[in-house]
């Protein structure tokens, strides 16, 4: 890392310095490849193949997945693997064939079945993840033409999707599998004797179950796939060539033999061996390491060799993890079971090691030498006492030695006994003995593709006659700077009988041998310590059951209810059903309303042809902007020195607050309390201080780090809500209160009064496309902004403000967004404004797309909330009064926090009538990035408190919480605490339908029986309703415009004020327009959202996109229809094109604007008390069943049933996709997704490595969605209802089901059912809430006696 790059290139065997590979069948020759360049950068920047996306840059999201094909040296066969292009060095591609999403199919030619089925099964919403998912499936099919569902599960371990909820992707790709059948599974309509696809009766309404027609799919013929380039297949020199690529800062070597490899290492001891680049790539990108010498050993025979020996299998250190897995599985099938226990243990651990794209290229040697303390494989290797073959080049010859993976192997954090000039050549996986037992376990936040919190491997030799321990190795990761062996505890086990007494003794000794300091990196101290003993106990149970099975121990050696403690979760095959109202047979075939039409851009998204902001072609004189960010959370800026950066060639300018006036620098979505560039003070880490304009993105980011900033720290640094309360750090004019009735009287007259509290954390938006902007200078001092924003008009307005110009000289365009979820509503300005300023000053196009870590540092999250409440209720359970205090963590500026708080205050009662309410709200000012809009906008946080209240009442009264719900449900015509009458409010219908469809009461009985029979596994079931108000909180935003241009050929160009962010808004608007004009949807096109087409647009937010823009589209259509009416009347049998042609020649205007303002909106308790707060409410109910592992805190969602009232659906496929996607996002909010900050305000969770979204394996095993029928809504376009945000809170059903399961565990342990469980219900919180004899061994340090590693905001 510190080695200079001026060393001479070694004189090796004949070398080759030209990079040759194939991309989509075309030969690429590069005579000067850059060793620091990734394949992704090469594809996008040099070859302009932009279908492959940059989502995270660390191999954690799969958006960059491509397929690599090459001749496998081990088998001499063509091998196809999916890889992460963001980590793959382009220099490693020599002699390979790369296939990108563009290379398998196109809308211009023909779609590949992989692309077609994903699109037509509605598996693409925003589309940014789609190319990566397509390529993961394509690579699987190139290896297995008919895979199993298990193969699909493994193939998608490394892919994330933030929009769909994964179900439609799996449904589409299930059609390729052996298990393919009816998508309805057990709920297939044929079970009831109905003919599939003809609809079913449901309460008098005809319902449909078919979102796509499988029979229309193009058959998959694997024989028609492109051939491997013959040039690569016929020329045998590709693998034997010694390659040397010398770049500006680094040299890449690919030696052809071990001697040359060792010579390089002898000459350059600090040289890095690169196999998969999965560790080094992350270090280079995010830690900014520079490695001048990179060596690729994948063509050295000894490093890739595999040999089966008498007592072991030898693996070269460069053999990929997937190859190791395949070979071990083959050996497990062939060899006696007792010989393969170590192999089985390794295979089990490899399944959860990263994603498949990583395992396809990562090597075990790299994992060992990296020496991560949370490596998944190192504990297995250490417990197995695996031997390594090590070599170095000394005095003209190769010298070998053997090293054992023992307690002394690691000498410190990421250090080991292998010398700098030595190389780990290979390792020996031992075959096990008959009475040797090896098991391993891993606990992470998410099962698939996640780093371990703690992992363990136990290798024990047991004398079958005395049933005593002969020898034992116990290795643990996550408990020290290195993987460690618990040698002291192992010593006391020798010669002891394997029984419960020994287990208890071991557990106590492990607690003593493996302590953790209260401030240890990684946090979760008590949880990690408990995992050590829990994982050993699971190993004890597993090995004991093996001893019972082999007859060494009697059958009654373990109580029956204890057996489940050894189990691990496995992903079940998905079962699902989607039920929606069937379109009437009387409806015209060309009328698309109510039909499951595919997303308008789905086919382009599946082929990589859909263009996102950063996919736009580079302009000749374009510059790239990199932001300079604050490294302090609260400090005064003493000086900014950009001289070193400006002196570097290729740097054109540095911008800071000195380059604009104070007035121009003051910005914000409502209150101008932010700055484009921090001037005198910084209030959070990640605040923008300046920007560097340079020739290319990699260079600009490097030079931005050369800007030196001196600070003076300011105290206090306020991070948490509790700290804000302690320091009374609130925004002005807060708290605010609203009330109805007489709360004090309710408390004085109540049978019961209870005080409680609940808390929930924030949530990162994690749209797959990060914030991006491109600004282009135009004539007459105009500027054009292409921006990934949900609010083009706000970007237009604030750009005009910063440039001191008028809005009519600024055009903001948004073609499509790779996700938004509210995070691109107001925060787009953090990128757009510096880009616009640089463009304006330099008069050159300027581009900026944030890296994932930058985006997460800068843009804010969902608001964390704290609620304190006091409730009054009768002995029967009827709520009579509530006083509640709502605190949200706003971050350093107001942004939209006041509106988020208001919605939480107006949603906390959820679906329940409370006659007397007083609610207060506090906007807490902290030293975090400004938190912002996020799908739900405070509603889910408020309803979270309401559901706690219901369950508190039920617990106190000893009643079923469902009975408390029934007693308190709002009725039709009831008045809320903000004076709104509830009309068309079918919450009870949803409630009872959900109870019936989920078979709730029967399932609960089964769960009770399960819990009685299982000590360490518990299940819970919970149901939650939701009531979500539809409208912007400020009345002026409840408006929309549209523009329709009909051209003389009859084609229609539709423009409206909404932005396509994946939610299908453009698709629905096309459907609305098609019905209104009575034309097929093929006539209509939407190009983009632009401020020069529709002015003064509202943000695409508040779930109001369809409601507002749809009505504006109808208004424009009505105007056109009136103009066309005489022409149609004169020629009633004419066609659309004939009518339009006639209108053109008669000089009838074929262009119309539409406008809509939502009526009756604008509630204000003082100024306008009779107005509505919301236009209407979208309702729904969901029920989920969860199983938890009480020993680890892991959980699995077994089933979810959702019934949603969304009026008359405009498009059932898109609406069900929104319901499922929102549910999964809500599930993540309440269980997996945790923002991790240091006490100093440093965000630790800055990418998918530390921040965990739900993955494919996290969806409910059975996932059923029903759209309520017969519930037309008179207050929105074509009787529909908004759907984007309302279903999200139903994800909370999982949280409360987890809490029910924990309660069962606690009751079995004799503990109170009254306990706190904060959201998200992470594995750590679940485990520590269960409380048992193992957690009781963990001593907690006194509060305030230490500074924790992380805190909860």
Curated annotation (Swiss-Prot):
Any one cellular-component term (Gene Ontology): peroxisome
List S-S links within the chain: none
2Fe-2S ferredoxin-type domain boundaries:
17-104
Cross-referenced Gene3D superfamilies: 3.10.20.30, 3.30.465.10, [2Fe-2S]-binding domain (1.10.150.120), Aldehyde oxidase/xanthine dehydrogenase, a/b hammerhead (3.90.1170.50), Aldehyde oxidase/xanthine dehydrogenase, molybdopterin binding domain (3.30.365.10), CO dehydrogenase flavoprotein, C-terminal domain (3.30.390.50), Uridine Diphospho-n-acetylenolpyruvylglucosamine Reductase, domain 2 (3.30.43.10)
Query: Which EC number(s) does the record attach to this protein?
Result: 1.17.1.4
Q: Which residues are involved in binding [2Fe-2S] cluster 1?
A: 56, 61, 64, 86
Q: Which residues form a coiled coil?
A: none
Q: Where in the cell is it found?
A: Peroxisome
Which keywords annotate this record? 2Fe-2S, FAD, Flavoprotein, Iron, Iron-sulfur, Metal-binding, Molybdenum, NAD, Oxidoreductase, Peroxisome
Which cofactors, by name?
A: FAD; Mo-molybdopterin; [2Fe-2S] cluster
The residues annotated as the active site are 1285 (proton acceptor)
Q: Does the keyword Protein biosynthesis apply?
A: no
Residues reported in the UniProt entry to bind substrate: 825, 903, 937
Q: Which GO terms describe its molecular function?
A: 2 iron, 2 sulfur cluster binding; FAD binding; flavin adenine dinucleotide binding; iron ion binding; molybdopterin cofactor binding; xanthine dehydrogenase activity
**Chain positions recorded as Mo-molybdopterin binding sites:** 790, 821, 935, 1102
Looking up PANTHER family in the UniProt record yields:
XANTHINE DEHYDROGENASE
What does the UniProt function comment say about this protein? Key enzyme in purine degradation. Catalyzes the oxidation of hypoxanthine to xanthine. Catalyzes the oxidation of xanthine to uric acid.
Family as reported in the entry's similarity comment: Belongs to the xanthine dehydrogenase family.
Q: By what name is this protein known? A: Xanthine dehydrogenase
Species the sequence originates in: Calliphora vicina
- Tell me the lineage of the source organism: Eukaryota, Metazoa, Ecdysozoa, Arthropoda, Hexapoda
Which gene holds the coding sequence for this protein? XDH
């Amino acid at each position: 890392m510190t080695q200079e790059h001026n060393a001479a290139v070694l004189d090796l065997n004949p070398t080759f310095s030209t990079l040759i590979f194939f991309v989509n069948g075309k030969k690429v020759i590069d005579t000067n490849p850059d060793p620091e360049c990734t394949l992704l950068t090469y594809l996008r920047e040099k070859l302009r193949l932009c279908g492959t996306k940059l989502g995270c840059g660390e191999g954690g999201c799969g958006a960059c997945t491509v397929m690599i094909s090459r001749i496998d040296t081990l088998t001499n066969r063509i091998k196809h693997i999916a890889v992460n292009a963001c980590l793959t060095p382009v220099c490693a591609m020599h002699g390979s064939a790369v296939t990108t999403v563009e290379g398998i199919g196109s809308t211009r030619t023909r779609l590949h079945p992989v692309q077609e089925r994903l699109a037509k099964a509605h598996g693409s919403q925003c589309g940014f993840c789609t190319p990566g998912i397509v390529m993961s499936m394509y690579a699987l099919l190139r290896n297995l033409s008919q895979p199993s569902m298990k193969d699909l599960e493994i193939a998608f371990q490394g892919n994330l999707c933030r929009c769909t909820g994964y179900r439609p992707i799996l449904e589409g790709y299930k059609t390729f599998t052996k298990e393919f059948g009816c998508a309805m599974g057990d709920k297939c309509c044929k079970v009831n004797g109905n003919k599939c696809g003809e609809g079913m009766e449901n309460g008098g309404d005809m319902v449909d179950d078919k979102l796509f027609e499988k029979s229309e799919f193009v058959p998959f013929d694997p024989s028609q796939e492109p051939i491997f380039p013959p040039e690569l297949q016929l020329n045998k020199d590709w693998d034997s060539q010694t390659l040397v690529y010398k770049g500006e800062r680094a040299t890449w070597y690919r030696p052809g033999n071990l001697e040359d490899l060792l010579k390089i290492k002898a000459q350059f001891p600090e040289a890095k061996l690169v196999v998969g680049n999965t560790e080094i790539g992350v270090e280079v990108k995010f830690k900014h390491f520079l490695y001048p010498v990179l060596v690729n050993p994948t063509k050295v025979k000894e490093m890739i060799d595999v040999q089966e020996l008498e007592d072991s299998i030898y693996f070269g250190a460069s053999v990929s993890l997937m190859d190791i897995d395949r070979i071990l599985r083959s050996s497990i099938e062939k060899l006696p079971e007792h010989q393969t226990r170590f192999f089985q243990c390794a295979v089990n651990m490899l399944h959860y090691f990263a994603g498949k794209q990583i395992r396809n290229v990562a090597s075990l040697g790299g994992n060992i030498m990296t020496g991560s303390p949370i490596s998944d494989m190192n504990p297995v290797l250490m417990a197995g006492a695996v031997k390594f073959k090590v070599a170095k080049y000394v005095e003209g010859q190769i010298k070998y030695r053997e090293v054992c993976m023992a307690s002394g192997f690691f000498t410190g954090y990421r250090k080991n006994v292998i010398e700098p000039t030595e190389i780990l050549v290979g390792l020996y996986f031992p075959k096990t003995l008959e009475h040797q037992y090896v098991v391993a376990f891993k606990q992470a936040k998410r099962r698939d593709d996640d780093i371990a919190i703690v992992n363990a491997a136990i290798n024990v030799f047991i004398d079958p006659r005395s049933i005593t321990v002969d020898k034992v190795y116990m290795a643990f990761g996550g408990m020290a700077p290195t993987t460690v062996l618990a040698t002291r505890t192992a010593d006391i086990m020798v010669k002891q009988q394997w029984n419960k007494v020994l287990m208890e003794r071991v557990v106590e000794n492990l607690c003593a041998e493996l302590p953790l300091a209260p401030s240890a990196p990684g946090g979760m101290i008590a949880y990690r310590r408990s995992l050590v003993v829990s994982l050993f106990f699971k190993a004890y149970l597993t090995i004991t059951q093996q001893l019972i099975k082999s007859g060494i121990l009697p059958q009654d050696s373990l109580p029956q209810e204890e057996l489940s403690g050894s189990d691990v979760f496995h992903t079940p095959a998905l079962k699902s059903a989607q039920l929606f109202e069937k379109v009437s047979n009387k409806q015209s075939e060309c009328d698309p309303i109510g039909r499951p039409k595919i997303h308008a851009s789905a086919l382009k998204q599946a082929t990589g042809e859909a263009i996102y902001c950063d996919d736009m072609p580079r302009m000749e004189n374009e510059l790239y902007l990199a932001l300079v960010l604050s490294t302090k959370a609260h400090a005064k800026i003493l000086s900014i020195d950009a001289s070193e950066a400006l002196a570097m060639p290729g740097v054109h300018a540095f911008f800071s607050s000195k380059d604009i006036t104070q007035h121009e620098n003051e910005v914000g979505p409502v209150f101008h309390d932010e700055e484009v560039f921090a001037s005198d003070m910084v209030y959070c880490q990640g605040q923008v201080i300046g920007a560097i304009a340079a020739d290319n993105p990699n260079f600009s980011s490097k030079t931005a780090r050369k800007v030196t900033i001196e600070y003076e720290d300011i105290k206090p640094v306020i991070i948490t809500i509790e700290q804000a309360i302690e320091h009374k750090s609130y925004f002005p004019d807060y708290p605010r209160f609203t009330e109805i009735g007489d709360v004090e009287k309710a408390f004085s007259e109540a049978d019961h009064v209870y005080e409680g509290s609940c808390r929930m954390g924030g949530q990162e938006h994690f749209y797959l496309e990060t914030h991006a902007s491109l600004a282009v200078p135009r004539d007459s001092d105009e500027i054009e902004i292409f921006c990934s924003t949900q609010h083009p008009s706000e970007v237009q307005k604030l750009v005009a403000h910063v440039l001191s110009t008028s809005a009519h000289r600024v055009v903001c365009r948004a073609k499509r967004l790779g996700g938004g979820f509210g995070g691109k509503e107001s925060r787009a300005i953090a990128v757009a404004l510096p880009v616009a300023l640089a463009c304006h000053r330099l008069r050159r196009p300027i581009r900026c797309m944030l890296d994932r870590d930058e985006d997460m540092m800068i843009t804010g999250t969902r608001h964390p909330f704290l609620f304190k409440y006091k409730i009054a209720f009768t002995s029967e359970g009827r709520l009579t009064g509530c006083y509640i205090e709502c605190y949200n963590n706003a971050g350093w500026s107001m942004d939209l926090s006041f509106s988020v708080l208001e919605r939480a205050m107006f949603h906390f009662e959820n679906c329940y009538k409370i006659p007397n309410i007083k609610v207060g709200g506090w906007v807490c000012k902290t030293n975090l990035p400004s938190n912002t809009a996020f799908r739900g906008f405070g509603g889910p946080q408020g309803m979270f408190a309401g559901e706690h209240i219901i369950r508190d009442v039920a617990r106190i009264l000893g009643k079923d919480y469902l009975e408390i719900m029934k007693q308190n449900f709002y009725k039709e015509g009831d008045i809320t605490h903000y004076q709104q009458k509830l009309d068309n409010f079918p919450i009870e219908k949803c409630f009872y339908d959900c109870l019936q469809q989920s078979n709730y009461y029967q399932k609960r009985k089964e769960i009770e029986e399960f819990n009685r029979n299982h000590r360490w596994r518990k299940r819970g079931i919970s149901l939650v309703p939701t009531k979500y108000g539809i409208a912007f909180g400020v009345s002026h935003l409840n408006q929309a415009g549209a523009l329709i241009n009909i051209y003389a050929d009859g084609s229609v160009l539709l423009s409206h004020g909404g932005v396509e962010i994946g939610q299908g808004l453009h698709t629905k608007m096309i459907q609305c327009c098609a019905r209104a004009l009575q034309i097929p949807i093929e006539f209509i096109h939407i190009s983009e959202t632009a401020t020069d087409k529709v002015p003064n647009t509202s943000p695409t937010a508040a779930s109001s996109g369809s409601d507002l823009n749809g009505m504006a589209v109808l208004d424009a259509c009505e105007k056109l229809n009136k103009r066309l009416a005489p022409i149609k009347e004169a020629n009633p049998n004419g066609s659309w094109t004939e009518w339009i042609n006639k209108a053109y020649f008669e000089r009838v205007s074929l262009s119309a604007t539409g406008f809509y303002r939502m009526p009756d909106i604008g509630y204000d308790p003082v100024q306008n008390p009779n107005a509505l707060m919301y236009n209407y409410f979208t309702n729904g109910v969901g029920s989920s069943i969860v199983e938890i592992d009480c020993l680890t805190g892991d959980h699995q969602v077994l089933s979810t049933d959702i019934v949603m009232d969304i009026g008359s659906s405009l498009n059932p496929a898109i609406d069900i996709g929104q319901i499922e996607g929102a549910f999964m996002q809500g599930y993540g909010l309440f269980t997996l997704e945790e923002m991790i900050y240091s006490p100093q305000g440093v965000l630790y969770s800055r990418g998918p490595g530390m921040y965990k979204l739900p993955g494919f394996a996290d969806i409910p095993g059975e996932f059923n969605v029903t759209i309520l029928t017969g519930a037309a809504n008179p207050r929105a376009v074509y009787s529909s209802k908004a759907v984007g945000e309302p279903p999200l809170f139903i994800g909370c059903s999982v949280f409360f089901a987890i809490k029910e399961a924990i309660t069962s565990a606690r009751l079995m342990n004799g503990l109170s059912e009254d306990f706190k469980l904060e959201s998200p219900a992470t594995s750590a919180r679940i485990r520590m809430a269960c409380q048992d004899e193992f957690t009781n061994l963990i001593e907690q340090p006194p509060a305030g006696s230490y500074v924790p590693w992380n805190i909860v905001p």
